[in-house]
């Protein structure tokens, strides 16, 4: 099984990277082939909203990393989307990627309803927030990022098999044993 991890955290040793590392190790120990893409290192131009991709099925802008990542998503059996919460949402770098590859994630029916193009692929969503638990949930911080990623993944046809959220990352810079266990469990659900 091929698993693609989209890591949208700019922090190489932060909580998201640690969580992704645990999931990667668990998936590989269960026979999966895992590739991690660090979204913050991608060279992607912003979408210009020309809407040509909706009728042509490809982006007319010059090729950049967005097309290469889309090909990896299409080849993968499962995807982990991991992002810290920025202002109750996903980071701009991840949103930029999703904006540019919308044509490969979903189409439209003849009456304009979304038509998923990635049906059958499994997905795990991961988010962190500096807002301490349980306020990160009550104030819709990390949950806001999960909500935004969930909307994109659902319209694309992914079956979301798990979500993992962690609050209070400003003070809790390392994963607890319980958090590592949740990450391993999510990785196993991705493979089953």
Predicted regions and their residues:
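N-terminal beta1-alpha1 ligand-phosphate binding loop
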Residues: 1-32, 132, 167
């Amino acid at each position: 099984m091929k698993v693609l991890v989209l890591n949208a955290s700019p922090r190489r040793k932060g909580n998201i990277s640690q969580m992704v590392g645990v999931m990667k190790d668990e998936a590989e120990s269960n026979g999966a082939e895992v590739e991690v893409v660090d979204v913050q290192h991608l060279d992607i131009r912003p979408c210009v909203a020309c809407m040509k991709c909706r009728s042509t099925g490809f982006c007319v802008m010059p090729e950049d990393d967005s097309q290469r990542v889309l090909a990896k998503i299409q080849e993968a059996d499962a995807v982990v989307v991991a992002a810290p919460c920025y202002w109750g949402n996903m980071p701009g770098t991840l949103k930029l990627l999703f904006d540019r590859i919308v044509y490969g994630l979903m189409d439209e029916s003849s009456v304009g309803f979304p038509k998923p193009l990635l049906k059958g692929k499994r997905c795990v969503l991961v988010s962190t927030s500096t807002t301490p638990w349980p306020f990160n949930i009550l104030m819709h911080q990390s949950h806001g990022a999960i909500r935004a990623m969930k909307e994109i993944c659902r319209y694309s046809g992914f079956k979301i098999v798990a979500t993992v959220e962690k609050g209070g990352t400003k003070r809790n810079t390392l994963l607890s044993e319980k958090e590592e266990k949740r990450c391993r469990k999510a990785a196993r659900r991705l493979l089953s």
